Amino acid sequence: LQDVDYAVINSNYALPAGINPTTDALVMEGSSSAYSNILAVKEGNEETDKTKALVAALSSKQVADYIAENYDGAVISVVENPGDGYDETVDYDALSGTTISVAATPSPHAEILSVVKDILAEKNVTLNIIEYTDYVQPNKVVDSGEVDANYFQHLPYLEDFNAENNTHVVSVLAVHVEPMGLYGGKQTSLDAIKK
């Protein structure tokens, strides 16, 4: 940051770089952003028990609390009315002993999924979190059916990806936002912009 006056950085990049958005940003975007990070599945799998179990677990109070307690506002849950982590329409007895696979980026997505893993384990369902550090493979492995779901992107990115790659991956849940922050480099306040 020393080479620029200001930099706009997404919390997804700030956190792994050791930058704390809530204390280091001069200003931050609010939680009403259109760029919520989503859980996505292959089109046609939106209503499977695996998907519904995953949605319920990611929509849980446990996940919302984990996000609030661990990211200090750098990641904000957008789930309204979080539940207990389970969907009463899912046949968890039939899912018992199965594995649900999710492609995710390491931070914060895979970290958040660790909470989901514990929730699903209560019903004897294994969550296999497969970490990716790129933004192409997670959609390809879901579209091919190799992986059940992914959690790493926002809807505008997914829509562009589908259009450019003829894939059929759809959003089933908005989970959180990673607000953009404006950080000072050579400048330490917003005074230079106010002129």
Predicted regions and their residues:
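A bilobed periplasmic-binding-protein/Venus flytrap-type ligand-binding module shared by bacterial periplasmic
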Residues: 35-53, 179-192
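Periplasmic-binding protein-like
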Residues: 58-79
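Short helix-initiation/N-cap motifs at beta->coil->alpha
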Residues: 1, 129-140
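Immediate post-signal peptide segment of exported/extracytoplasmic ligand-binding proteins
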Residues: 81-101, 120-121, 190-194
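Short Pro/Gly-enriched coil loops immediately N-terminal to beta-strands
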Residues: 28-36, 171-179
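Alpha-to-beta junction loops
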Residues: 2-9, 143-153
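Short, well-ordered beta-strand elements
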Residues: 95-107, 125-131, 195
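Ligand-binding "clamshell"
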Residues: 16-28, 160-172
